[in-house]
A protein has these predicted regions:
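Nucleotide donor/acceptor-binding cores
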Residues: 1, 72, 165
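NAD(P)+-binding Rossmann beta1-loop-alpha1 motif at the extreme N-terminus of oxidoreductases
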Residues: 1-51
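Residue-level detector of anion-binding/catalytic polar loops
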Residues: 2, 25, 197, 259, ...
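Short, hinge-like loop/turn segments at secondary-structure boundaries
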Residues: 44-47, 117-120, 159-163, 216-217, ...
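Rossmann-like NAD(P)(H) cofactor-binding subdomain of soluble oxidoreductases
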Residues: 54-154
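Internal alpha-helical scaffold of NAD(P)-dependent oxidoreductase catalytic cores
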Residues: 93, 134-211, 217, 223-261
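NAD(P)-dependent Rossmann-like dehydrogenase/reductase catalytic/cofactor-binding core
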Residues: 231, 239-333
Length: 333
């Protein structure tokens, strides 16, 4: 397949490397020193898991998506706040049969497209400030994706795959008689051939929330404390903040028809397995990058307000982490 990965950073880099290794025609959209390194030397993956090895794959790396033309699959590995500006150019990669797969954190902009409830078509302004993203690409091309993997870019052109290989993919159109379409099975098979653990979801929005409630609580707390996951899960004082945020997230999900089927303490037990891992917002603050507060936290507060679900602890923590980001020069006031 002809594959383009838009944003070949941490997760995008893992996807690009493994799909290229599996024989697909892969190109990447990147910027700056990272793009220069990939274009000149190839993309290097340092695997900290099964292989315990380092390898390099040559691939085309460009800054402008419009130079590549339509693809079979386009993965978006950007931070959520970077997507609105770039999406019009990403749209040039999408042909009539292209699968557009946003492998992103937080509430995705497509969440209420073809959602099939009274909320169908709702715009989440925390992730789509101008309310125009739904018109930039056809919703029929979008495949939902939830990533359960950890990676970091530690130097230009080099991605460290530090944990997990889980990629859940699913159709976003709830009117389909069978969500296991031929194209979704083809995509999952390609990911498996690339030695990733791909599963097909019959309800991708439930999978979005299953990950989101953890990110909603652990990410801002990690960013405020610089504590890794093991330390957070071992601190009853921090868990006294995490638990009510988990309860609030579960309540918002339920108000939109999603029942996760997991208690806060069960979700904390899942997080314990991450050990000394530094969660994404923690990494962003340490690297002095703009954090995904809007997509991961503010969007949930926005959705809570629309259905009158109180989220006082989430609001308080969001205010704290936002002010920390402003003070550090990562966000504007």
């Amino acid at each position: 397949m002809k594959v383009c990965v838009v944003g070949a950073g941490a997760i995008g880099g893992v996807l690009a490397f493994r799909l290229a290794t599996a024989g697909h025609d892969v190109s990447v959209i990147a910027r700056g020193a990272h793009r220069t390194a990939i274009a000149s030397r190839g993309l290097t993956l340092v695997d900290h898991q099964d292989d315990q090895r380092t390898a390099t794959q040559p691939m085309q790396a460009v800054e402008d998506p419009t130079s590549l033309g339509p693809q079979d699959v386009v993965f978006i590995g950007l931070k959520a706040h970077a997507i609105p500006e770039l999406l019009p150019r990403v749209a040039t990669l999408v042909g009539p049969t292209t699968m557009l797969v946003p492998a992103i954190n937080g509430v995705p902009w497509w969440y209420f497209q073809r959602e099939g409830s009274v909320h169908d078509g709702l715009v989440v302004h925390s992730v789509d400030p101008a309310g125009t993203m739904h018109a930039m690409v056809a919703s029929s091309s979008i495949i939902g994706c939830v990533v359960h993997a950890a990676a970091e870019v530690r130097e230009p052109g080099v991605v460290h795959h530090t944990g997990g290989k889980g990629f859940i993919v699913g159709e976003i159109d709830r009117s389909l008689p069978d969500p296991r379409t031929a194209r979704i099975e083809r995509l999952a098979a390609a990911l498996r051939d690339a030695r990733l653990d791909a599963t097909v979801s019959s309800d991708i929005r439930k999978d979005v929330w299953s990950k989101l409630i953890g990110n909603l609580s652990f990410n801002p707390v990690a960013a405020l404390t610089y504590a890794h996951m093991g330390r957070i899960c071992g601190s009853e004082a921090l868990l006294d903040v995490i638990r009510p945020m988990l309860r609030e997230g579960l309540a918002v999900a339920s108000a939109y028809g999603i029942e996760i089927g997991m208690t806060p303490d069960q979700r904390i037990d899942v997080a314990r397995y991450l050990g000394a891992a530094r969660i994404s917002m923690h990494q962003d603050f340490e690297a002095h990058r703009k954090p995904e507060i809007d997509a991961i936290v503010t969007a949930v507060i926005e959705l809570a307000g629309r259905v009158d679900v109180p989220v006082p602890i989430t609001r308080m923590v969001e205010a704290l982490v936002r002010e920390r980001a402003i003070s550090d020069g990562l966000l504007s006031a």
